[in-house]
Amino acid sequence: MAFGGILSEADISAALQNCQAADSFNFKTFFAQSGLSSKSADDVKNVFAILDQDRSGFIEEEELKLFLQNFSASARALTDAETKAFLAAGDSDGDGKIGVEEFQSLVKP
């Protein structure tokens, strides 16, 4: 698991369990249940780097859609509505993607 040493398997499993149904994903709840919101800024940056699949320095909409699958290969993709809401919440500068600082603000408001 790519998040070993940052997040516990049990916390990740619990967070994923609570958003199995379509349109049930809430990023604030997920970050709290997975333990991410209580991690250091460096840990949050490390998680961002894992989520930034193409290493562009940003998490784009397509990467957000597959957000849950970064935590478990068997997790579902986010719905279009969930993806757009997640992007809108995190994209504070309106460029259509989430940078590392925006991600940190999203995780630790």
UniProtKB/Swiss-Prot annotation:
Q: Which residues bind Ca(2+) 1?
A: 52, 54, 56, 58, 60, 63
Q: Name one Pfam family in it.
A: EF-hand_7
Q: Which SMART domains match?
A: EFh
What keywords is this UniProt entry annotated with?
Calcium, Metal-binding, Muscle protein, Repeat
Q: Name one GO cellular component term.
A: cytoplasm
Q: Which domain of life is it from?
A: Eukaryota
| The EF-hand domain, residue ranges | 39-74, 78-109
| Amino-acid positions noted as binding Ca(2+) 2 in the UniProt annotation, renumbered to this chain | 91, 93, 95, 97, 102
What Gene3D superfamilies does the record point to? EF-hand
Q: Which GO terms describe its molecular function?
A: calcium ion binding
Q: Which PANTHER family match?
A: PARVALBUMIN ALPHA (PTHR11653), PARVALBUMIN BETA (PTHR11653:SF24)
Family recorded in the similarity comment:
Belongs to the parvalbumin family.
Instruction: Provide the function of this protein.
Output: In muscle, parvalbumin is thought to be involved in relaxation after contraction. It binds two calcium ions.
* Protein name (Swiss-Prot/TrEMBL): Parvalbumin beta
Species this chain originates from: Xenopus laevis
Lineage in the entry? Eukaryota, Metazoa, Chordata, Craniata, Vertebrata
